[in-house]
């Protein structure tokens, strides 16, 4: 079984029930619903289908809602036709609501005029088109075209190294999150997170909706997010390394070391981390990936990512199933070559103080020394399972919980197989019940050595933030 989890983006391809079923059967752990596209009716159709299929297939496939976020886009064009911008020409961005042409186009963020300055760079459509600001009025930004090309409708606008004063959460995001809560989603991927305040605003809104339990994965997509990465990691439940916009906002050659830095920081802080964007991009058109793409996926696994993500590859590419199967194959092959002993030593060197960390590390160390069959982590909240997962043991981790939401959240935890249990009330119940369940699911056999770690309520143990792991048995 692969340990690194895979997030697949839903789209036109997955309107086909059997295609969605095949993705579930072939290794998709989390289904991503991108709310930059489609309406609620379309998204509900796919979510309902996924829920039906995971029941039929007896899986815990989680649902991740990816918000559109406070992004800037260009407006519509005359007759919907693309325009051609040529190097050296003058092109104007306007906050007025107009139908664009080859002279000017509207933008969705009216405050951009105040945020930018003469001489700064504006990039459109993932950086394919580059503009330099020459002058501005109250409603217009007059630019010269530095890098020309074809411009279509509603393309993304990036302004590198400029602090944009967009709201942390838009009205559309609120509407989409409200809809997601009604649909019992498992994660929110918050787009264009710039600081901890962005995360806290979304958490406050979730509390208003009566859903404070939904984890927030912060998407770091610009220089401001990188600058504030430590406070964002503290505030969020996880991080998505969104390399698409990130590689536009900052020099592309900076992305690899930033990816490694973010993954390491998330590992050190027991936070989920997803590596995303263009991982097998060529498989949108071709049945096989490039060697560079294979290496990219493998390096993310070596770096310590919890999950890797497929975007357009599964949403609308020509080879959605083949892309997933290739991702699984790359991940499994790479994991065969991981140096688990070195990983464990490194984890010990960076171990944070606290009972949960100490017990988790002792459990993984014992499992390694005894060549245990697996590590069993009974947990209502999933906190114990998360700690053990972050230590990256060679052994399979059985995350056992009576909580359906926790079970689905475990779908993104590295190395974890989630199992649904009954409620346990005593320490003996926890231990015997968890082992009985593991045997019933054929995860262990009689005579196998297993390590079990859990959190047992105890007045003598200082409770850390959230739950505390304070018991280990062999």
Predicted regions and their residues:
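Non-catalytic helical/linker scaffolds that mediate oligomerization, partner binding
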Residues: 1-474
